């Protein structure tokens, strides 16, 4: 271990097989609580209006920390640092140009992070934005995702997709 790296292929007990017991005083880190949810049906949004995204289908929710039916928000049950992420797929229902889009992450009702794009040329009718951050959260904080889409004409839509419109978070083990 001259370079400070321990490389191990197999660990066995003193008899050469069996389970290894972790002794007292050892801290095991976990990335829970955690959740991920997605939008199961397209959500129509008013053109140019900041709208809460209603991620209504949970993929997993280890500690009942995500409300997928009323407030569409994440409220941690354990204080700590959390990795929080979201992706939104914006689209126009016609061949109308998307002018700009914004994805906002809110903490306790106020904007915490924002990602946006402005389209100046071309005929873009779909666009994906994502946001990731590490947040210090207590048990009464809550996090929500908002989207805003400006289009030339037609209907502004956040497209439903487990693979491209989702929201999740997990507690960092440290």
Tell what function each PLM region has:
Residues 2-6, 14-17, 28-174:
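Extracellular jelly-roll beta-sandwich "head" domains, especially the C-terminal globular C1q domain
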């Amino acid at each position: 271990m001259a370079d400070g790296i321990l490389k191990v292929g197999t660990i066995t007990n003193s008899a050469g097989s069996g389970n290894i017991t972790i002794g007292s005083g050892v801290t095991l880190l976990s990335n829970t609580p955690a959740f991920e949810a997605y939008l199961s049906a397209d959500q129509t949004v008013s053109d140019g209006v900041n709208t809460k995204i209603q991620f209504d289908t949970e993929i997993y929710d280890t500690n009942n920390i995500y409300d997928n039916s009323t407030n569409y928000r994440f409220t941690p049950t354990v204080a700590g640092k959390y990795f929080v992420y979201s992706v939104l797929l914006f689209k126009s229902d016609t061949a109308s140009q998307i002018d700009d889009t914004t994805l906002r992450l809110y903490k306790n009702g106020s904007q915490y992070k924002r990602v946006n794009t402005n389209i100046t040329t071309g005929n873009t009718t779909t666009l994906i934005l994502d946001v990731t951050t590490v947040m210090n959260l207590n048990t009464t904080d809550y996090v929500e995702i908002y989207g805003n889409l400006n289009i030339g004409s037609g209907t502004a839509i956040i497209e439903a997709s487990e693979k491209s419109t989702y929201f999740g978070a997990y507690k960092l083990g440290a």
